[in-house]
């Protein structure tokens, strides 16, 4: 019966993976591999910079909690936490450089930056990225990165400055100022640490999202900073 059905028609079942692809596929795979090799240094730098920037920001967050709570025991670790948080400017500069390398097209860590993906007339149009483009667009993204870096840089500079001055003057006014700036950083960190986890890390794959990701990111770096 089967011989009658297939009579006159030759069927060939691929025996291995090499028969499933053609020369055009090899070219596409080569392009993809080249793209990955090109991005490897940038992805490694982003991972390291984000890790240590997060640790230093969490160290300042922990220190600010002690100042806001008027804790006395933390005086023995104050200078240690301030030293750890001193990496914020360095990590911030590295993250800014990576941001502008991606915006300039030198690095390609964030494929949502490709304008073709949000252009309805493009053959590469992605409806999911189009819907997210109100948040994931280059101008707004750069503004947010600047807020994270400059804001964290300002708070670590200000808190360390007031803390050092308080050691010298023992002035109640400086004590109150240290409290106020610490409370300000706690509020800033609460919003910024969530948003920079989205921007620097989760937006690498903008089709995937998790409501718990920001907590994993913050708690991981906070535990490391301690």
Where are these regions (language model features)?
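Low-complexity, proline/glycine-enriched hydrophobic segments characteristic of transmembrane helices
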Residues: 2-40, 117-123
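Loop-to-helix transition at the N-terminal end of transmembrane alpha-helices
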Residues: 37-54, 79-82, 212-218
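Central hydrophobic cores of alpha-helical transmembrane segments in multi-pass inner-membrane proteins
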Residues: 53-71, 152-156, 160
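Intramembrane catalytic core of multi-pass membrane enzymes that act on lipidic substrates
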Residues: 84, 88-158
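Alpha-helical transmembrane segments of multi-pass membrane proteins
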Residues: 1-5, 58-62, 100-104, 191-200
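Flexible loop linkers connecting adjacent transmembrane helices
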Residues: 68-83
């Amino acid at each position: 019966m089967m011989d009658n059905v297939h009579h006159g028609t030759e069927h060939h079942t691929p025996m291995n993976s090499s028969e499933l692809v053609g020369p055009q596929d090899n070219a596409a795979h080569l392009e993809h591999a080249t793209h990955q090799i090109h991005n490897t240094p940038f992805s490694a730098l982003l991972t390291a910079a984000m890790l240590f920037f997060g640790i230093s920001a969490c160290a300042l967050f922990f220190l600010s909690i002690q100042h806001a709570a008027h804790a006395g025991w933390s005086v023995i670790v104050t200078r240690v936490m301030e030293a750890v948080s001193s990496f914020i400017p360095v990590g911030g500069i590295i993250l800014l450089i990576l941001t502008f390398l991606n915006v300039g097209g030198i690095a390609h860590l964030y494929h949502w930056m490709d304008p073709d993906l949000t252009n309805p007339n493009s053959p590469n149009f992605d409806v999911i990225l189009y819907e997210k483009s109100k948040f994931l667009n280059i101008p707004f993204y750069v503004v947010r990165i600047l807020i994270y870096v400059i804001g964290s840089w300002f708070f670590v500079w200000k808190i360390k400055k007031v803390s050092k001055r308080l050691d010298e003057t023992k002035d109640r006014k400086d004590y109150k100022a240290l409290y106020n700036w610490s409370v300000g950083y706690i509020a800033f960190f609460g919003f910024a640490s969530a948003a920079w986890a989205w921007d620097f890390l989760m937006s690498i794959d903008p089709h995937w999202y998790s409501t718990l990701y920001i907590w994993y990111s913050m708690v991981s770096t906070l535990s490391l900073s301690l």
